[in-house]
């Protein structure tokens, strides 16, 4: 059973598999190699991917996207407050955690971001299963290199809820570097800068790639809240203000109008990557008012100027951390859809004094490609060019504990290789102190109050002693997923305690995860029921129209008028019933079909027999077959019926 690689993106996701020495990026059921990270809830069903994005203008309040911008964050995060202004769906606080409120099948539901992400992951898993023809459980999932511990852990939880065994969480730029290194058969030692600007996040990583097989990350930097969505927001704000200026109407109060404007803005943004001007035409955008306008590339660049410039700070930081200067970078590789923006490219090129940028890998698929390779390596595949691949990644943020006075004492420095383990000895702050509270933080600031709290645990039962005498050994163990385990041991008694950091404010408890796993199975069952319901409805519709067509087109003399009217009346009754019972259950459709078949079958059989009899008289036995085939009176579809 192969393992798959999934690029779980803010706006689009992508899945790949490594087999027969090659990576296949797998197209979904719509034939697209990337799938929108959208989940929609309606009165009757749940939609994921393309169908969800296609109906967003009709159902903006119950169509959820950008879950990656919520995952692993606290509700009071200022970034979330900023995003809520742009989202048509409702985000509420549930014990400090953000939850998404929607209406589903007439009921109000609340979903954690992990649940929404897990639904997208299920879609990617099903896409791979349909292609490979077998069930899949093992996967490697990518995250932005700058994701913190709680965001990584929450992504892993989403995989678990989706029924996946997450072999590894790997960093997106590292995965892209893997794709670049293997695809280009690099020779010698090369310093490669991966510039990854996607729909919602931005990463820069510098790697040294040796002979295309040793991938060593030297440094990483980024912004987990910068990407194409932010450029869209700027354009939408500009267009909404233009509409208000022209027509004295504020459409921002109307989610549907805003969504249609956003879709047009996104399309215009893409157009501006290849043209210098984009036209926006939206009929009856708001209160019957059409909106036609043009946006120039220069205007778009001006609207996003500060955001584009902000991409250069992490590049500088990554170079400093790697202790390299610009001239030591051999290749600058662009990844992520937003790197298609000409201004982003020209700023980066100027920063590197006119050096050519490498556009040779597919920016939408490179991350999933690398994830698929890593999945194959972790599941023991030793074939082809991946057999010698070794990947060495780094920690994106420093990790430490709070010591007296609120000082951040680092145990693991940022950009240290992972997995890694560090131990330091601490002592008590006051005489006869019976226990210590170990508070774990991540970040680069000197004081813990300015850093991100990951978790706390207490070590008690320390024997009475003067301050500074007890020896408490604290060990930080950062695993290959970038997830932290912390242990503390009092040396004289040997008392020890350890925790995997579970960010109490941002993380899901095991009980919540178990509940979500059960609910995910329930939703999958409901989706299956909905599919079966639609199949039954289609079977009934198709039978009604086929019978109606056959009777309508029956040659004169084959069917007497009474029988014909009887069939047509019954068919018309059924069509009326279908129109007024669109949400009927599968059993009702099946029952209607049975009833209709019982009524029409004898008449249809009689019609065929008459046709067959006439044929035998006219052209001997040989004509029977042909006559029978045409027995539906001009109906050209199949004339064989399955007998139950």
From Swiss-Prot:
It comes from the Eukaryota. Changing residue 122 to A: In strain: DSR 4. GO terms for biological process: response to heat. Residues 610-644 are annotated as: Disordered. Residues 612-636 have a biased composition (Gly residues). Changing residue 306 to N: In strain: DSR 4. InterPro entries: ATPase_NBD, Heat_shock_70_CS, HSP70_C_sf, HSP70_peptide-bd_sf, Hsp_70_fam. GO terms for molecular function: ATP binding; ATP-dependent protein folding chaperone. Induction: Heat shock induces the synthesis of seven proteins at five otherwise inactive sites in the polytene chromosomes of fruit fly larvae. Two separate sites, producing two and three copies, respectively, code for the 70 kDa protein. Keywords: ATP-binding, Nucleotide-binding, Stress response. Signal peptide: none annotated. Most strains have three copies of the gene coding for this protein at chromosome locus 87C1; two tandemly repeated Hsp70 genes (Hsp70Bb and Hsp70Bc) and one in reverse orientation (Hsp70Ba). Some strains, including that sequenced in the Drosophila genome project have three tandemly repeated Hsp70 genes (Hsp70Bb, Hsp70Bbb and Hsp70Bc). Belongs to the heat shock protein 70 family. This is Major heat shock 70 kDa protein Ab. It comes from Drosophila simulans. The lineage of its organism: Eukaryota, Metazoa, Ecdysozoa, Arthropoda, Hexapoda.
């Amino acid at each position: 059973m192969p393992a798959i690689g999934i690029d779980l993106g803010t706006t689009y996701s992508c899945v790949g598999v490594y087999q027969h020495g090659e990576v296949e990026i797998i197209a979904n059921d719509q034939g697209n190699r990337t799938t929108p990270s959208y989940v929609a809830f309606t009165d009757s069903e749940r939609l994921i991917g393309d169908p969800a994005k296609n109906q967003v203008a009709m159902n903006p309040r119950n169509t959820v996207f950008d879950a990656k911008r919520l995952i692993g964050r606290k509700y009071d995060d200022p970034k979330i407050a900023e995003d809520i202004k742009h989202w048509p769906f409702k985000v509420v606080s549930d014990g400090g955690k953000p939850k998404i409120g929607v209406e589903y099948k007439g009921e109000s539901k609340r979903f954690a971001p992990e649940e929404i992400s897990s639904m997208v992951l299920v879609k990617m898993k099903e896409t791979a299963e349909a292609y490979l023809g077998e069930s899949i459980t093992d996967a490697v999932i990518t995250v932005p290199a700058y994701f913190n511990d709680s965001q990584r852990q929450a992504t892993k939880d989403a995989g678990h809820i989706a029924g996946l065994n997450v072999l590894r969480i790997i960093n997106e730029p590292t995965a892209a570097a893997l794709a670049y290194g293997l695809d280009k058969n690099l020779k010698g030692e090369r310093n490669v800068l991966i510039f990854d600007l996607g729909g919602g996040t931005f990463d820069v990583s510098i790697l040294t790639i040796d002979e295309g097989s040793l991938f060593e990350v030297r440094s990483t930097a980024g912004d987990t809240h910068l990407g194409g969505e932010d450029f869209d927001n700027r354009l939408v704000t500009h267009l909404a203000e233009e509409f208000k200026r022209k027509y004295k109407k504020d459409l921002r109060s109307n989610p549907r109008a805003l969504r249609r404007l956003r879709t047009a803005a996104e399309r215009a943004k893409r157009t501006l990557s290849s043209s210098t001007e984009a036209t926006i035409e939206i009929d009856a955008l708001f209160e019957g008012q059409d909106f036609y306008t043009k946006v120039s590339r220069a205007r778009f660049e001006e609207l996003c100027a500060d955001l584009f410039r902000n991409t250069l700070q992490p590049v500088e930081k990554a170079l400093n951390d790697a202790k390299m200067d610009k001239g030591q970078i051999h290749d600058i590789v662009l990844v992520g859809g937003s790197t298609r923006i000409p201004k982003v490219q020209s700023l980066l090129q100027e920063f590197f004094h006119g050096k050519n940028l490498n556009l040779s890998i597919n920016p939408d698929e490179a991350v999933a490609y690398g994830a698929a390779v890593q999945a194959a390596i972790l599941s023991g595949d030793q074939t082809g060019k991946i057999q010698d691949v070794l990947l060495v990644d780094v920690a994106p943020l420093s990790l430490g504990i709070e010591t007296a006075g609120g000082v951040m004492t680092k145990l693991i420095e940022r950009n240290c290789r992972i997995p890694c383990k560090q131990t330091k000895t601490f002592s008590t702050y006051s005489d006869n102190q019976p226990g210590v509270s170990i508070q774990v933080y991540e970040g680069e600031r000197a004081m813990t109050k300015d850093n991100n709290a990951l978790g706390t645990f207490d070590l008690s039962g320390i024997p009475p002693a003067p301050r500074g005498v007890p020896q408490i050994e604290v060990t930080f163990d950062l695993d290959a997923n970038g997830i932290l385990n912390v242990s503390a041991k009092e040396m004289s008694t040997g008392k020890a305690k350890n925790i995997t950091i579970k960010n109490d404010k941002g993380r899901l408890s095991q009980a919540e995860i178990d509940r979500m796993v059960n609910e995910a199975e329930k939703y999958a069952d409901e989706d299956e029921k909905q599919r079966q319901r639609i199949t039954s409805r289609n079977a009934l519709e198709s039978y009604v129209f086929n019978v109606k067509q056959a009777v309508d087109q029956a040659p004169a003399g084959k069917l007497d008028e009474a029988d014909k009217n009887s069939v047509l009346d019954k068919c018309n009754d059924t069509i009326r019933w279908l129109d007024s019972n669109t949400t009927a259950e599968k059993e009702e459709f099946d029952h209607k079909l049975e009833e209709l078949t019982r009524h029409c079958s004898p008449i249809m059989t009689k019609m065929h027999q008459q046709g067959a009899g006439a044929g035998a008289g006219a052209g001997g036995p040989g004509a029977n077959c042909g006559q029978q085939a045409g027995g539906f009176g001009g109906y050209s579809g199949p004339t064989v019926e399955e007998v139950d």
